[in-house]
Regions:
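A broad, structure-centric signal for solvent-exposed, well-ordered loop/edge residues
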Residues: 8, 14, 62, 73-76, ...
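Short, exposed beta-strand "edge-strand" segments with a Pro/Gly-rich flavor and a Y/T-containing core
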Residues: 19, 37-40, 95-102
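Short loop/turn segments at connectors of secondary-structure elements within structured domains
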Residues: 23, 49, 84-85
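Secretory targeting and sorting signals
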Residues: 1-29
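SH3/SH3-like beta-barrel superfamily modules
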Residues: 68-109
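SH3-family beta-barrel domains
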Residues: 5, 27-57, 69-71, 112-116
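Short alpha-helix capping/helix-loop boundary micro-motifs
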Residues: 58-65
Length: 116
């Protein structure tokens, strides 16, 4: 009985100390710039110029990374916009099913050719 009470107390203490920021929460929204986009380019191919290229919720490193692209992945480029330290393209990674923003300097041919 004492062991069960101790485990319950430890579990409650651990749960109380964990801070979670959920997508769409004010804290996350405040740090991530405008992320609106449209399918304007539509080109598909292998556009990551390396491996482990972050795919983010917006055009900034302050935005959450939802996945990583690899050079072998097939993607569709949607459009680009100015963001943190240059331009970023919105894309869909067919290999992983993830979509989001990647910095154009990490994409073959500087990313999408249509502005959002």
């Amino acid at each position: 009985m004492r062991l069960r009470s101790t485990l319950a107390a430890v579990t409650l203490a651990a749960a109380a100390t964990v801070a979670v920021v959920l997508p769409g929460s004010p804290a996350l929204a405040a740090s991530c710039p405008d992320n609106g986009w449209s399918i304007l380019d539509g080109r598909t191919g292998q556009f990551f110029n390396g491996n482990s290229v972050n795919i983010r919720t917006g055009p900034s490193t302050a935005c959450v990374a939802v996945g990583q692209g690899q050079a072998s992945h097939q993607v569709m480029l949607d459009c680009y916009k100015s963001g943190e330290n240059g331009t970023w393209s919105h894309l869909y990674d067919f290999t992983t099913g993830k979509q989001g923003w990647s910095k154009d300097s990490l994409l073959v041919g500087a990313g999408a050719n249509k502005h959002c």
